[in-house]
Amino acid sequence: SQKNIDTGMGLERLAVVMQDVDSVFDIDTMKAIRDKVCELSGKSYQKDALDDVSIRLITDHIRSATFMISDGIMPSNEGRGYVLRRIIRRAARHGRMLGIGGTFMAKLAATVIDESKDGYPELEEKKDFIFKVLTQEEEKFAKTIDQGLAILEKMEKEMQTAGEKTLSGENAFKLYDTYGFPLDLTQEILEEKGFSIDEDGFKKAMEIQKKKAHDAHKATNYMGADACLLYTSDAAD
């Protein structure tokens, strides 16, 4: 029998070799998405190192998100759905950093589908659904990101004034609980500016919140009424 060697290259890396380009972002399918990001943002690739990070990140994340939604994964707060939510929100933030206004994910997903539909016809069949999911998640995040970024900026200034380099777990949890900022997003923004997060403090704040929610649930009956009031009412009767 013929022996084969698994190089572990993957299709993209193999395409880099076959197309004689420098990186996966230069192969034909990825370049089309990358160029669309540049078109929407008005930025040029390989002109600014920070812009390039955002361009590559959005290119990678929108491709992943498009395929995940096609596979039936929906944005949520747990499991694979949480991974999807994180990459959509991360791409949305980097879109803002590039100056892209409004929702833009569906426009990029259309390019992903055009480039991949021959090999993955299900993308074309599900494109309207994919566009809808991306746009809804993007709009949901847009409602909170501006407020959250403003609050985080205020926290950064307070840390600078106090000569501190670590955001308290309580403040990190406030951003998560009130403004929908995943911990890793807050962490990414802060690390760009030389700050860190008290992750243990964040976990503690989350446990306190879970306990409060659990205790509140125990204190109510199935219709949400205060159990103590019900018992008092029964006794009075």
Identify the function of each model-found stretch.
Residues 1-131, 188:
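Feature marking long nucleic-acid-engaging regions of large polymerase/nuclease enzymes
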